[in-house]
């Protein structure tokens, strides 16, 4: 590696060390490096070395061995020439860096626990202990707050009850009568269990008397309107027959006296009957209207037919 160089032989046979050769090649003949660094490049300097986190250790002292070996290499003529030793880099800064390396500040630490460690608890003694929560206070009647004013719902008045007109409702009376008859039939049916018989016998006399009196009063109230309605219908029928007979006799005389007046009055009577029926029925019933027209024609035009036939 460190053979004699022709330039050194001409200048006094001085032998050049490997360090000098490397220095010359690095200054003059070193090829241009690529900008991209490679992992295997020993001359590359990392970011950690630039920032100072990792000490930079140069391996210049490793070249001392080859330099000494090169200085003692024999020359071509058989003589051993002692060359000049290459200037070595001082080893003191390296030693200082190695000594200062343990004292550098560590930039990482062990992960701390997520929850802090609880302090040691004292040893509890046996016996009752006070609770952490206070006991509830006892409130007497005097401690209670006075009742406040009633809510708005209590001040509200109920809706007025609608007064329905007094109508004769046959359907309601019929349903009530059927329900009472069905109840009586069920009570009179044989084959009931002894439990129902015992329950009926064990009822108080007051309840039985009250129910019986209420039933009798209800029946009495039901009988009176029924009789009154029947008598009213019979009376209306008698009055209608008498009124129709009177009109028939009157139109008989009118047709004999003046037929024109009798015709006008007959039309008016028929219209009056139709209006009366509609007012009484309070419904638009075609059958009732036709019946009223037929009765009016019979009363007013019947005498004319008898006169024409006689």
Curated annotation (Swiss-Prot):
Membrane-spanning segments: 231-251, 257-277, 286-306
Comp. bias (Basic and acidic residues): 56-66, 183-197
GO cellular component, one term: peptidoglycan-based cell wall
Composition bias, Low complexity: 198-209
Biological process according to GO: biological process involved in interaction with host
Membrane topology: Multi-pass membrane protein
Residues with the N-acetylthreonine modification: 2
Location in or out of the cell: Cell membrane
Keywords: Acetylation, Cell membrane, Membrane, Transmembrane, Transmembrane helix
Keyword Cell cycle appears in the UniProt entry: no
Region annotation Disordered: where it falls in the sequence: 22-163, 178-209
Family: To M.leprae ML2433.
Protein known as: Uncharacterized protein Rv0497
Organism: Mycobacterium tuberculosis (strain ATCC 25618 / H37Rv)
């Amino acid at each position: 590696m460190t053979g004699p160089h022709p330039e050194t032989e001409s200048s006094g046979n001085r032998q050049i060390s490997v360090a000098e050769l490397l220095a010359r090649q690095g200054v003059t003949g070193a090829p241009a490096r690529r900008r991209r660094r490679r992992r295997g490049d020993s001359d590359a300097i990392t970011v950690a070395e630039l920032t100072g986190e990792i000490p930079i250790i140069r391996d210049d002292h490793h070249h001392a061995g080859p330099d000494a070996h090169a200085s003692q290499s024999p020359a071509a003529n058989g003589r051993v020439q002692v060359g000049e030793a290459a200037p070595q880099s001082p080893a003191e800064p390296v030693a200082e860096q190695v000594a200062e390396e343990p004292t550098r500040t560590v930039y990482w630490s062990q992960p701390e626990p997520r929850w802090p460690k609880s302090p040691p608890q004292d040893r509890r003694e046996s016996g009752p202990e006070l609770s952490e929560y206070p006991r509830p206070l006892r409130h007497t009647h005097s401690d209670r707050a006075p009742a406040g004013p009633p809510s708005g719902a209590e001040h509200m008045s109920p809706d007025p009850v609608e007064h329905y007109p007094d109508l004769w409702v046959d359907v309601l009376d019929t349903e009530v009568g059927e329900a009472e008859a069905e109840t009586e039939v069920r009570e009179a049916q044989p084959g009931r269990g002894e439990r129902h018989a015992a329950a009926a016998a064990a009822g108080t006399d007051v309840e039985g008397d009250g129910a019986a009196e209420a039933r009798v009063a209800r029946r009495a109230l039901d009988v009176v309107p029924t009789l009154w309605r029947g008598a009213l219908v019979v009376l209306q029928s008698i009055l209608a027959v008498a009124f129709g007979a009177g009109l028939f006799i009157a139109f008989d005389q009118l047709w004999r006296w003046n037929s024109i007046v009798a015709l006008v009055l007959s039309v008016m009577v028929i219209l009056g009957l139709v209006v009366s029926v509609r007012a009484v029925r309070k419904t638009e019933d075609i059958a009732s209207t036709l019946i009223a027209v037929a009765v009016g024609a019979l009363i007013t035009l019947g005498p004319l037919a008898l006169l024409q036939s006689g």
